[in-house]
């Protein structure tokens, strides 16, 4: 059906046979700049290249061990025609170091350090905008207007890198402009993690008894450099900040497509968004609220076997303090206990209790008691199940407990 949707409903004008033949040309043959049959997804997107490098070293002695890791990761962008690869990519740098030392026969010390930096650079135009443009822009519209030698526009060509981007009153954005002349933004995130742990066997008191304590601290900060070209609005219409050009209003793009007479006759171009050059890129720096989280826990563990009887117990203290910018600190504190018993790994009993608090609640209502218990029976350990070859493990378990949530106030 020869139907030109950009014409009025009562217009008898259709695409000429020349325009139809041009539209049928092989994809990618747009060397004269007239477009005809753009595949915008092919024009705008490309497969990305991933690079991942890492170097690790480990070693030590009977009493001390270490591990060091450094890595570099780069993912190229999926956009073609961006200003450079550095304006369309993702970078990540990782570092980790772990050291474990047996200070004495019973005392062990562990130090873990980790750091990560990520950099994400992207065009000023959003991915949603670029994908929407690829889906909706008519494929017969030109992307770049050819330099037809008209003296009126020679200065404009020089000021715009030797080419003019096409747009009109109906299609105000240009794919090449969105990719290469909308500016860019760069978001950098930094993470730092560290922990220090001590553990000590207390078997000189009783067999199976041990104690451990750990302190950790994590930090995070983020800043974004915004060098994107701002858009501007006229009435209820939004225009890009880069300059776009079109034919004078007395000409239509359909005449362009049907006979190309206008550019052959050296006609002049006029601005489509009242800009002869691109607006200046933005130059702003924004910071996310820095975050710092400290955690401390201490625990006493007991595990021992008495013939066919297995007994374990644990008492834990936990504290967390999180600071986000100038906000009120988020604090959590709690004590937990657990005791387990089993007979021949067949009959299982467990009891847990927690006494936990959060600063989200008012004074006098910050702590709660949360008990839980369970019983279990490993049926497959019974003598009458030994000859049932199609069942390796069968356990029945029932449990009941109370839990808390501090995100309800």
Residue ranges and their predicted role:
Residues 66-68, 109-111, 209-215, 311-315, ...:
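Transmembrane beta-strands of outer-membrane beta-barrel proteins
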Residues 1-39, 138-178, 229-230, 237-290:
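Flexible glycine-rich, low-complexity coil/linker segments exposed to the extracellular/periplasmic environment
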Residues 31-71, 75-82, 86-172, 185-189, ...:
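Flexible loop and strand-edge segments within Gram-negative outer membrane beta-barrel domains
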Residues 62-63, 106, 188, 201-211, ...:
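Short loop/turn motifs that connect adjacent beta-strands in outer-membrane beta-barrel proteins
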Residues 50-54, 90-94, 189-195, 293-297, ...:
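Transmembrane beta-barrel architecture of outer-membrane proteins
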Residues 53-61, 97-101, 194-200, 298-302, ...:
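Residues on the lipid-exposed face of transmembrane beta-strands in outer-membrane beta-barrel proteins
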Residues 168, 386-409:
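Solvent-exposed loop/turn elements at secondary-structure boundaries
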Residues 219, 317-372, 387-391:
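Signature of Gram-negative outer-membrane beta-barrel scaffolds
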């Amino acid at each position: 059906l020869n139907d030109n949707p950009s014409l009025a409903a009562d217009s008898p004008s259709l695409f000429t046979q020349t325009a139809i033949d041009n539209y049928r040309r092989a994809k990618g043959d747009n060397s004269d700049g007239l477009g005809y049959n753009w595949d915008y997804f092919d024009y705008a997107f490309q497969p990305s290249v991933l690079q991942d490098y890492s170097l690790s070293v480990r070693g030590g002695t009977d009493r001390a061990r270490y591990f060091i890791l450094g890595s570099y990761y780069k993912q190229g962008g999926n956009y073609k025609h961006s200003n450079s690869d550095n304006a369309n990519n993702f970078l990540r740098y990782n570092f980790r170091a772990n050291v474990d030392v047996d200070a004495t026969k019973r005392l062990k010390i562990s130090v873990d350090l980790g750091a990560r930096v990520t950099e994400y650079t992207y065009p000023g135009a959003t991915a949603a905008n670029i994908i929407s443009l690829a889906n909706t822009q008519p494929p017969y519209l030109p992307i770049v207007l050819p330099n037809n030698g008209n003296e009126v526009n020679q200065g404009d060509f020089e000021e715009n890198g030797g080419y003019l981007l096409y747009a009109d009153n109906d299609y105000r954005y240009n794919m090449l402009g969105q990719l290469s002349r909308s500016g860019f933004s760069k978001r950098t995130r930094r993470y730092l993690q560290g922990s220090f742990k001590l553990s000590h066997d207390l078997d000189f008191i009783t067999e199976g008894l041990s104690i451990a304590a750990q302190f950790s601290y994590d930090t995070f900060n983020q800043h974004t450099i915004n060098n994107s070209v701002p858009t501007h609005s006229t009435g209820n219409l939004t225009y890009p900040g880069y300059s776009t050009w079109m034919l004078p209003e007395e000409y239509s793009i359909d005449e362009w497509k049907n006979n190309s007479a206008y550019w052959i006759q050296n006609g002049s171009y006029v601005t489509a968004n009242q800009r002869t050059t691109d607006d200046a890129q933005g130059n702003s720096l924004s910071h996310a609220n820095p975050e710092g989280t400290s955690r401390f826990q201490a625990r006493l563990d007991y595990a021992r076997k008495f013939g066919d009887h297995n007994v374990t117990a644990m008492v834990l203290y936990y504290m967390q303090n999180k600071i986000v910018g100038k906000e009120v600190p988020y604090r959590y504190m709690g004590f937990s206990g657990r005791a387990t018993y089993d007979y021949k790994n067949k009959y299982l009993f467990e009891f847990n209790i927690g006494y936990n608090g959060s600063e989200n609640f008012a004074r006098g209502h910050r702590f709660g008691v949360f008990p839980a218990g369970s019983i279990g029976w490993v049926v497959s350990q019974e003598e009458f199940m030994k000859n049932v070859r199609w069942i390796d493990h069968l356990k029945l378990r029932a449990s009941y407990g109370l839990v808390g949530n501090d995100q309800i106030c």
